[in-house]
Swiss-Prot record:
Residues 258-340 form the Toprim domain. Binds 1 zinc ion per monomer. This is DNA primase. Its EC number is 2.7.7.101. It comes from Buchnera aphidicola subsp. Schizaphis graminum (strain Sg). The gene is dnaG. The lineage of its organism: Bacteria, Pseudomonadati, Pseudomonadota, Gammaproteobacteria, Enterobacterales. GO terms for cellular component: cytoplasm; DNA-directed RNA polymerase complex; primosome complex. Mg(2+) 1 binds at residues 264, 308.
Length: 579
């Protein structure tokens, strides 16, 4: 990426970003001394081991060794690539990315995204204007019970049956039409006739977390337009498997929702919201993905699924459970609402009203109850064969859960269900030993040079204590070139913190050792760091003098020294005597 997004811009982004505030938009932090702590979002953390340093603009987990700066956090937590994480920070700070001339591919993608945002927004406004003048669309929404407040809140629109009439009505320019065709927002048939993909449909805009419109969903209002439901084609800003409909609207009202209620369709979301059921979203159908699960858990600790009361809905609930199991933890849980046959959230809220539906939410089945309710279907517990097949089917699913507590709890229920009550017999159901990564800090030896580099990485302002490096140049001491390289970078960038320093070296050959040393516990108290750094620097210089002294002494024994060399060894002896 070097040479594509300028390093000065990346550094400026990190300088503007407060990593504590950024992480707190995703997870709750608690102040602990000068740092902030919480349970690690990257592994099943029983005690808070995730530390965020405002001073260093750096995070580190003592449990799983996850670490990095603001960019790394977005890459790992939001599942973004490097460029996407830069785009996210740039959006937060409302600044454009100044791609340089070498970054042609990235720049084209970035500009294409900006163009798509613009086109989607403009089309959405046209759809919204159009619905005002379309009696059939208004009649349909009225029959579905959707009021004007919801139409406005969710920016609902309508696409006319004929593009030429639509374009004339709103005076759409040819250049705009060409852009829409180029980005496949509208299309042409084999006869060259332009048509809107969503023609004859109610249009539901889909927003990203920043409120930008990234795609549309359409619902036909007559039986002769098929398919009944339609989504935009995937593009650079829209990936169906990663989007949650209604999440932006929920977050507008509740920055940290206590739960999220997942339903199947747009109208389910809208109707429940209209009836004052909070926190409702949709995964754009029943095809839930692991990305959906991860996104939902980033915004809340409890996700409740409420699919339609038919075979497709029940199958979707079971499929969702299986996909979600690896992401369940002691703090992240899922629940299920099972609706009566042939009911969906839209129909049942109209029959029952808000209070009764809220009771369904309050009494939603826990994950464990739903799991055993489904897995015990058609199982004859009086049959040893059935009990065996039950355990064969259940155990692999239970083993997907990372939480020891939940996994053991489910195994105990399974053991009791199949009639195993003796602890010794139950051993075969106990969890496999969890492999814990050996902390990187124990994989490398403590050496003076590594401590020197580690202190500098963790405290870049120490560079101001070194007025000159001439006496260290051209010396062959292991690690010294790395130290001098970092020292120069810190001197050239006096305001760098640890996070910015690591970002500077993201694509260099030394980044791995720098990452290790950035989180290395050197066990030196803060008040003594400066003196320790200077002592190590002095000792390094002494080591250089000693090596030169040995070389001159060896030469003297073999062939003697020149006058200049004799003066040099005298000077070295004098300096070393002052140690």
């Amino acid at each position: 990426m070097s040479g594509k997004i300028p390093k000065y811009f990346i550094n400026e982004l990190l300088f503007r970003t407060n990593i504590v505030e950024l992480i707190e938009t995703r997870i709750k932090l608690k102040k602990n001394g000068k740092n902030y702590q919480t349970h690690c979002p990257f592994h099943n953390d029983k005690t808070p081991s995730f530390t965020v340093s405002y001073e260093k603009q750096f995070y580190y987990c003592f449990g799983c060794s996850a670490h990095g700066n603001a960019i790394d956090f977005l890459i790992n937590y939001d599942n973004l690539n490097f460029v996407e994480s830069i785009e996210e920070l740039a959006t937060i700070h409302s600044i454009e990315i100044p791609f340089d001339k070498k970054g042609t591919i990235e720049k084209k993608i970035y500009l294409k995204k900006q163009k798509l945002y613009f086109l989607m927004d403009k089309m959405s406004k046209l759809y919204q204007k159009n619905i005002i003048f379309t009696n059939s669309a208004n009649k349909y929404l009225t029959e579905r019970g959707i009021n004007k407040n919801m139409i406005d809140f969710f920016c609902i629109g309508f696409s006319s049956n004929k593009w030429d009439l639509f374009s004339k009505q709103f005076n759409i320019k040819k250049d705009f039409e060409k852009d829409l065709l180029h980005y496949k927002i509208i299309s042409t048939n084999k006869n060259g006739y332009i048509y809107d993909t969503f023609q004859g449909r109610i249009v539901f805009p889909i927003h990203d977390q920043h409120g930008r419109i990234i795609s549309f969903g359409g619902r036909s209002i007559t039986n002769n337009i098929l398919p009944k439901y339609l989504n935009s084609h995937e593009n650079d800003i829209f990936h169906k498997g990663k989007q949650i409909y209604g999440l932006y609207q929920v977050k507008k009202k509740h920055s940290k929702p206590k739960y999220l209620l997942v339903v199947e369709g747009y109208i389910d979301v809208i109707m429940l919201t209209q009836y004052n059921i909070e926190y409702v979203v949709s995964s754009l159908g029943t095809s839930i993905t692991k990305e959906h699960i991860q996104i939902l858990f980033r915004h809340t600790n409890t996700v409740i699924y409420c699919y339609d009361g038919d075979d497709a809905g029940r199958n979707a609930s079971w499929r969702t459970l299986k996909i979600a199991l690896p992401y369940i933890s002691d703090k992240k849980n899922i629940k299920f609402i099972i609706l009566p046959n042939n009911e969906d959230p839209d129909t049942i809220i109209k029959k029952e009203g808000q209070k009764k539906f809220q009771l369904r939410i309050d009494n939603a089945l826990t994950m464990s109850k739903f799991f055993f309710k489904n897995i015990l279907k058609n199982v004859d517990l009086s049959s040893d064969d059935d009990k065996f097949h039950l355990s064969v089917r259940a155990l692999p699913l239970i083993n997907c859960i990372s939480s020891d507590t939940i996994r053991i709890y489910l195994r105990q229920i399974l053991a009791r269900t199949i009639g195993i009550v003796d602890d010794y017999q139950f051993e075969k159901f106990l969890y496999e030993k969890e492999r814990k990564k050996k902390s990187l800090q124990f994989q490398i030896k403590h050496t003076p040079m590594r401590t020197l580099i580690g202190l500098l990485i963790q405290n870049p302002n120490l560079a101001r204590l070194v007025p000159s490096t001439k006496k260290f140049e051209n010396e062959k001491i292991q690690g010294l070139p790395i130290f001098l390289e970092i020292l120069k970078t810190c001197s050239d960038n006096p305001n760098f913190n640890t996070g910015q320093l690591l970002e500077f070296y993201r694509y260099s050959k030394i980044i791995n050792i720098l990452k290790i040393l950035s989180k290395w516990d050197h066990m030196i108290i803060k008040e003594k760091i400066q003196n320790m750094f200077l002592d190590l620097l002095k000792n390094t210089y002494s080591k250089i003098l000693e090596k030169r002294q040995e070389k001159l002494i060896a030469k003297e024994r073999i062939q003697g020294l020149t006058i200049d060399e004799k003066k040099e060894i005298w000077s070295i002896n004098k300096k070393l005597s002052k140690k």
